[in-house]
A protein has these predicted regions:
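Walker B catalytic acidic pair
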Residues: 68-70
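Loop/turn-to-beta-strand initiation segments
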Residues: 35, 61-64, 96-102
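Conserved lysine of the Walker
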Residues: 13-14
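P-loop (Walker A) phosphate-binding loop of NTP-binding proteins
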Residues: 8
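Conserved P-loop NTPase motor module
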Residues: 120, 135-207
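Hydrophobic anchor at the beta1->P-loop junction of P-loop NTPases
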Residues: 5
Length: 207
């Protein structure tokens, strides 16, 4: 299953990604997980490190793959640089007992092929009750334009009946909301890590 999460900078995306990683690591240790490893492309205690370019090339079987800031490697405008090997990984991930969670600041900036394969989507927001991070499910709709007869994709939040069924853990509805206590996760990752090293320079002051 491929699940997408999006939210503005500083809303808690990496915190929530760490929550899923640490939760799965605990399940693996207790032999309660279908996975054997957890891979992340950001520094996260106990997880295996990987590079996006390795997807579809190296074996990621029986694993939970968590990708932070996916648009760095799979931007919708840079579709020509999106390799076929990576496409194959997302298409056949279930064949290898692999689930993918990805996080981004802009949902519509993610490569279209990945968006089309995304089965669940969540919007991340900072809770008014700091320091909690919340994520709310968003459902995609598909209608036919009566004038052009073309498919029109839209989005909506869960309706009353879906919220009601979720109370009984209905599998078809799925999880509608996540709420995590951020401080207990901060020790597992560095929110201010710098993935790039830029050249130093001396800016000039306007006269």
């Amino acid at each position: 299953m491929i699940t997408g999460f999006f939210g503005v900078p500083g809303c808690g995306k990496t915190t929530l990604a760490t929550f899923f990683a640490q939760r799965e690591l605990k399940r693996i240790k207790l032999f309660q997980s279908k996975f054997k490893r957890v891979y992340t492309n950001f520094s996260c205690s106990g997880c295996y490190r990987f590079d996006f370019r390795q997807l579809g090339v190296l074996d990621f079987s029986d694993a939970l793959v968590i990708i932070d800031e996916i648009t760095i490697d799979a931007d919708n405008r840079a579709f020509k640089s999106f390799k076929q090997e990576s496409v194959d990984f997302f298409i056949y991930h279930r064949h290898y007992n692999c689930d993918v969670l990805y996080f981004t600041q802009q949902w519509d900036a993610v490569d279209k092929k990945i968006r089309n394969l995304t089965q669940a989507l969540y919007r991340i927001k900072k809770s008014y009750l700091f320091p909690f991070v919340t994520a709310k499910a968003i459902f995609r709709t598909c209608d036919i334009n009566e004038y052009t007869s073309e498919l029109v994709v839209g989005y909506r939040f869960p309706n009353f009946w879906e919220v009601f069924l979720a109370l009984f853990h209905n599998k078809k509805v799925g999880k509608l909301r996540y709420c995590v206590f951020a401080p207990r996760l901060w020790k597992f990752f560095d929110s201010y890590s710098r993935p790039f090293t830029w050249a130093k320079w001396s800016p000039q002051i306007w006269s």
